[in-house]
C-alpha cells in the first residue's frame, strides 16, 4: 500500500566564485528567498511547489530567483551559475509520518518532514529507535501516526 505523500520541490541557484561575498546568511523577506554564503559560492534558495516525482523542473521558479538576485546584488559578478531542484517528501497535512506502518507488516516509517528533515531527523531517529526496541517514552506521537492515512486508503 502507498502512504499519502507528495513531492514538495525546492529550487536554488548557486553563484560560483562571486566578486563579493555576504558575511552572513540573509533572509530576504521582500524577495522571499534566502542567501547563504558558502565556500567559493553563494546559494540563493527560495520557491516551493508541489508536483509529482516524475515532473521535470520548471523554469519559472528559477527565473524568479534570478530576478531577486539581480535586484539584491546588481553589481555582483561571478564565474558561472548552477541551478538545482530537489524533492522532499511531504504529507498532505504537513505533519511527518512517524511510527508503525501496519501496511508493511512489522515495519516503521519516519519521513515527510518537509524543510525540517535535517533538524528533526535526530529526534525522530531516537523516537523510532525507542519504538522498535520497545523502550517507553513520554512523547505523544498520535498526530504523526501513519495510520491516519492507511485507514483511508
Tell me what each language-model feature is.
Residues 1-105:
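Active-site substrate-recognition segment that forms the wall
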Residues 97, 101-153:
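C-terminal lid/capping helical subdomain adjacent to the catalytic/cofactor pocket in oxidative enzymes
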Amino acid at each position: 500500500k502507498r502512504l499519502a505523500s507528495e513531492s514538495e520541490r525546492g529550487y536554488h541557484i548557486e553563484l560560483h566564485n562571486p566578486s563579493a561575498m555576504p558575511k552572513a546568511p540573509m533572509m530576504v523577506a521582500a524577495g522571499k528567498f534566502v542567501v547563504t554564503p558558502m565556500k567559493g559560492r553563494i546559494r540563493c534558495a527560495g520557491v516551493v511547489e508541489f508536483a509529482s516525482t516524475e515532473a521535470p523542473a520548471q523554469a519559472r521558479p528559477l527565473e524568479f530567483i534570478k530576478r531577486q538576485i539581480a535586484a539584491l546584488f546588481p553589481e555582483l559578478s561571478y564565474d558561472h551559475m548552477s541551478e538545482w531542484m530537489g524533492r522532499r517528501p511531504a504529507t498532505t497535512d504537513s505533519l511527518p509520518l512517524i511510527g508503525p506502518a501496519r501496511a508493511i507488516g512489522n515495519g516503521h516509517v519516519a519521513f515527510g518532514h518537509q524543510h525540517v528533515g535535517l533538524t528533526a531527523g535526530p529526534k525522530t531517529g531516537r523516537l523510532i529507535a525507542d519504538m522498535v526496541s520497545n523502550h517507553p517514552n513520554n512523547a505523544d506521537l498520535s498526530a504523526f501516526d501513519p495510520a491516519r492515512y492507511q485507514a483511508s486508503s
